[in-house]
Amino acid sequence: VSATAPLLLDDRSSANLCSDPGNNSSACWRLVTDGVMGGVSDGRLQPAQIDGRSCLRLTGAVSTLNNGGFIQASLDLDNAGLLDARTYRGIEIDVYGNAETYNLHLRNADTRIVWQSYRASFQAPPRWQTVRLPFAELQPYRIEKPLDLSRLRRLGLVAIGRDMQADLCFARVSFYP
């Protein structure tokens, strides 16, 4: 059985860091940097208006010094437990950026160590664009298990892996059927 309509995770109708898509739980985005492991990357996550659209804007300087190299906007997918996304084919994100490459990191109940995730890269051009990332194209990172879509826990939009200036805005995040 497949879903017939997208599952909206965030449409930026909220003026703060919390998603408010009208579902039963409103989760809040949070900024995570490599400072949790001794890195020196610096980031900010704040609501913004870009080219007429409300969005969250992830900005900062990513530095690979001290074994670092990331800043991330992270969203827990279900406050009540784990989210079952088996009836969806992937994640759709409306993005506006600075022509850099960013990552989507998806975590589930099997990703118990902080660096484990399922990943895909995407370009964020300096104009609004909808990016579709099929679940089938997510690559496991430091985990041997295939992606179990029935137990999703968190997603992250990440500037990672190289020295760079991050400037990524996202206005809508959903699972698509």
Which residue ranges define each predicted feature?
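Beta-rich carbohydrate-recognition modules and glycan-binding surfaces
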Residues: 1-177
